[in-house]
C-alpha cells in the first residue's frame, strides 16, 4: 500500500481537495486502484449538524455517512463509492479513544494525545486504506489522504504528529507528501511572491514532515525564476515544484499536472508500476490515451462555456443561496447534465424568502420574481427549517401553472405536495409537520416514525435506498431506463419527513402521481405531474450519485425540457 498525503498552507480553501482528487484520478487512469481519505480536524463526529452557511453542503455516502463536501469531489473524480470511515474527524477519534478508556482497554495508563490519539489515527488510516471502493475488485494500491485546514492550526496538530509517525510506520518508500501553497502577486509590483510558501513549508518541516512536492496555487503560470526560488528555500527538488494556476474548469487540473510530469514523478517516488502503457498517445494528439477521456470532458466543458448560443437559465430557489457551496453537488449535477446535452447552462440564484412580499424589500421581491419568470427551468433543492418555505410554495405553484420545467429535491418534493394540496385539493391550510404548529392545519408531510426527535446527528433516513417504480408511463421512468413496474433504482437519501401516507391516494387521484415508492410501498419517493412538460420531484438526492461520465437522470430531464422551452421563446 502506498500513501500520498496532501497538506495545505497559507490559507484554507486553496484547492487541496481538487488537487488531491486530480492526483488520485491520474493514478486511477494509469490502471491503479485508488482510495481517498479526508481528515477534518473538528470535534464534530460528522458534518451532519453543521450549518451550510459555515461549512457548505453535507455530502451523503452510500452507507449513510454525512461527510465533508470534498468526499463528493473524490467520488466524482474517481467514480468510486466511499464510506463514512473515509472521513476522519477529531470527534470520531476522541470518541473512540474515550470509549476504549471507559472499557479499560488501556490497562490503567494515562491516556494522552501522544501516543493514544496519534496511534488511533494511524490505525484508522491503515484500516480504511485497505477497504475496496470499487466493488469487489480488490484492495486499493494507493490511498490519497487530504489533511483539512492549514498547517500550523492547533486543531490539526494531533493529525500532523500522527502523520509524522506514520511515515516511518509504513516506510518512507511508501509515503509521499504533497504540500499545496499560495504564490500571490502584489498588484503594484507584479512579482510572484514566494515568502508565504517558504514560511508554510518551514512550519511543516518544523513539525517533522518534509514535502516531496510543492504544488503552488497562483493566478498565472509559475515563472522559472519562481520555481527555482521555491526549490532553493523550501528544500524541494526543482522538478517537484509544480505550478497549479487558474484554469478554465476543474477538469483541466489533472491535465495541467500531467503536463508538468507529476504522474511520472509520483510513480518514481513511490516505486509504483502503472498498469497501462504510458508512452501510448491518443490519435493525432499529444495527450496520453489514458487521459484522453478526461481531456474530452475538459474540452466539452470549455466548448459549452464559450458557445455563443443563448444558455439555459435555471432558477435555483433555495434557503442558503448566500453560499453556493451549500449546493455544490447540485451545481455539479447540473454541469454534468449540461455537458451531456452539450448546451451551456447558467444558474440564477433566487433566495426563497425574497419571493414572499412580507419578507423582502420591494426591489428584492421584484428582482427575484423577474429571475424566476426569466428562467427556462426551476429547481428547488433540499433544506431544513421554515424560513423561505412560503416562497418555495409560490415557486412550485408558478412552475405548475405556467408549464415551466420543475425539479424538486427532498424538501422540493414536500413543497410540491403541499402546494398541490393547497391549490388543487382545496386544503387551504395544508402544511408540513416541520413548519406548522400542532393542530393548525392538515399536515400532508409528517415526521417519520422511526426518526429520533431528541437527537439531530445521524438520526435521519440516510444513505442509499431502493426506489421501486409503480408506474412506467411517465417521463422520469424513461430517463432512468425503467420499462417495467417493480423495477428499482438506487439513490441516496437524507430526510426526517415524508409525505403523509393517509393523503396519498386522494392526491394521486387528482393528478399528482406518485410513481416511485420505497420497498415497503408506504413511503413516497417520486412524484410527477403528467400533463406538464416536466414537473418532477424526488424525496432522494439524485445529485449525490451524478458523475461527469454518468449524469443524473432527473437533471438530464430538467435541462432537456428547459432547452425545449428556450427554443420556443
Curated annotation (Swiss-Prot):
A GO MF annotation of the entry reads: identical protein binding
Q: In which pathway does it act?
A: Pyrimidine metabolism; CTP biosynthesis via de novo pathway; CTP from UDP: step 2/2
Q: Which SUPFAM superfamilies match?
A: Class I glutamine amidotransferase-like, P-loop containing nucleoside triphosphate hydrolases
- Residue intervals of the Glutamine amidotransferase type-1 domain: 313-569
EC number assigned by the record: 6.3.4.2
GO cellular component entries: cytoophidium; cytoplasm
On whether ATP-binding is a keyword of this UniProt record, the answer is yes
Superkingdom per UniProt: Eukaryota
Which reaction is recorded as catalysed by this protein?
UTP + L-glutamine + ATP + H2O = CTP + L-glutamate + ADP + phosphate + 2 H(+)
Free-text function comment from the UniProt entry: Catalyzes the ATP-dependent amination of UTP to CTP with either L-glutamine or ammonia as the source of nitrogen.
Q: What is this protein called?
A: CTP synthase
Provide the taxonomic classification: Eukaryota, Amoebozoa, Evosea, Eumycetozoa, Dictyostelia
Amino acid at each position: 500500500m502506498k500513501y500520498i498525503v496532501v497538506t495545505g498552507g497559507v490559507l484554507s480553501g486553496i484547492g487541496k481537495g481538487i488537487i488531491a482528487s486530480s492526483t488520485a484520478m491520474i493514478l486511477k487512469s494509469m490502471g491503479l486502484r485508488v482510495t481517498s481519505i479526508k481528515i477534518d480536524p473538528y470535534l464534530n463526529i460528522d458534518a451532519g449538524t453543521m450549518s451550510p452557511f459555515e461549512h457548505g453542503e453535507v455530502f451523503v455516502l452510500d452507507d449513510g455517512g454525512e461527510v465533508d463536501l470534498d468526499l463528493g469531489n473524490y467520488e466524482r473524480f474517481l467514480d468510486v463509492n466511499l464510506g463514512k470511515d473515509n472521513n476522519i474527524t477529531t470527534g470520531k477519534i476522541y470518541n473512540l479513544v474515550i470509549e476504549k478508556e471507559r472499557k479499560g482497554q488501556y490497562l490503567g495508563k494515562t491516556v494522552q494525545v501522544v501516543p493514544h490519539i496519534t496511534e488511533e489515527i494511524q490505525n484508522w488510516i491503515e484500516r480504511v486504506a485497505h477497504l475496496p471502493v470499487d466493488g469487489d475488485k480488490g484492495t486499493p494500491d494507493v490511498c490519497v489522504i487530504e489533511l483539512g485546514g492549514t498547517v500550523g492550526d492547533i486543531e490539526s496538530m494531533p493529525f500532523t504528529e500522527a502523520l509524522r509517525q506514520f511515515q516511518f510506520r509504513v516506510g518512507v518508500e511508501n509515503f509521499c507528501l504533497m504540500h499545496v501553497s499560495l504564490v500571490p502577486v502584489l498588484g503594484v509590483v507584479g512579482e510572484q511572491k514566494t515568502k508565504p510558501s517558504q514560511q508554510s513549508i518551514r512550519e511543516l518541516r518544523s513539525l517533522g514532515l518534509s514535502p516531496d512536492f510543492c504544488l503552488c496555487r497562483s493566478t498565472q503560470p509559475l515563472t522559472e525564476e519562481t520555481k527555482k526560488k521555491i526549490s532553493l528555500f523550501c528544500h524541494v527538488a526543482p522538478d517537484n515544484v509544480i505550478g497549479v494556476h487558474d484554469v478554465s474548469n476543474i477538469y483541466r487540473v489533472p491535465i495541467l499536472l500531467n503536463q508538468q510530469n507529476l504522474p511520472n514523478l509520483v510513480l518514481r517516488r513511490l516505486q509504483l508500476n502503472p498498469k497501462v502503457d504510458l508512452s501510448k498517445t491518443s490519435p493525432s494528439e499529444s495527450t496520453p490515451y489514458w487521459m484522453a477521456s478526461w481531456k474530452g470532458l475538459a474540452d466539452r466543458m470549455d466548448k459549452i462555456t464559450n458557445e455563443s448560443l443563448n444558455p439555459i437559465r435555471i432558477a435555483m430557489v433555495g434557503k442558503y443561496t448566500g453560499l453556493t457551496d451549500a449546493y455544490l453537488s447540485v451545481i455539479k449535477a447540473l454541469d454534468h447534465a449540461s455537458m451531456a446535452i452539450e448546451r451551456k447552462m447558467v444558474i440564477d440564484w433566487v433566495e426563497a424568502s425574497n419571493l414572499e412580499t412580507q419578507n423582502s424589500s420591494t426591489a428584492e421581491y421584484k428582482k427575484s420574481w423577474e429571475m424566476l419568470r426569466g428562467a427556462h427551468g426551476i429547481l428547488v433543492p433540499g433544506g431544513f427549517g421554515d424560513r423561505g418555505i412560503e416562497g418555495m410554495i409560490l415557486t412550485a405553484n408558478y412552475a405548475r401553472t405556467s408549464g415551466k420545467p420543475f425539479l424538486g429535491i427532498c424538501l422540493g418534493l414536500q413543497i410540491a405536495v403541499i402546494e398541490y394540496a393547497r391549490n388543487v385539493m382545496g386544503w387551504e391550510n395544508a402544511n408540513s409537520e416541520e413548519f406548522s404548529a400542532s393542530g393548525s392545519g392538515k399536515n400532508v408531510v409528517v415526521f417519520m416514525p422511526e426518526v429520533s426527535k431528541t437527537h439531530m446527528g445521524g438520526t435521519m433516513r440516510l444513505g442509499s435506498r431502493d426506489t421501486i417504480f409503480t408506474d412506467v408511463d411517465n417521463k422520469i421512468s424513461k430517463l432512468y431506463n425503467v420499462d417495467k413496474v417493480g423495477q428499482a433504482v438506487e439513490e441516496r437519501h437524507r430526510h426526517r419527513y415524508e409525505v403523509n401516507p393517509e393523503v396519498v391516494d386522494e392526491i394521486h387521484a387528482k393528478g399528482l402521481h406518485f410513481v416511485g415508492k420505497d420497498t415497503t410501498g408506504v413511503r413516497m419517493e417520486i412524484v410527477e405531474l403528467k400533463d406538464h412538460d416536466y414537473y418532477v420531484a424526488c424525496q432522494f438526492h439524485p445529485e449525490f450519485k451524478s458523475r461527469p461520465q454518468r449524469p443524473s437522470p432527473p437533471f438530464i430531464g430538467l435541462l432537456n425540457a428547459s432547452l425545449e422551452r428556450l427554443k420556443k421563446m
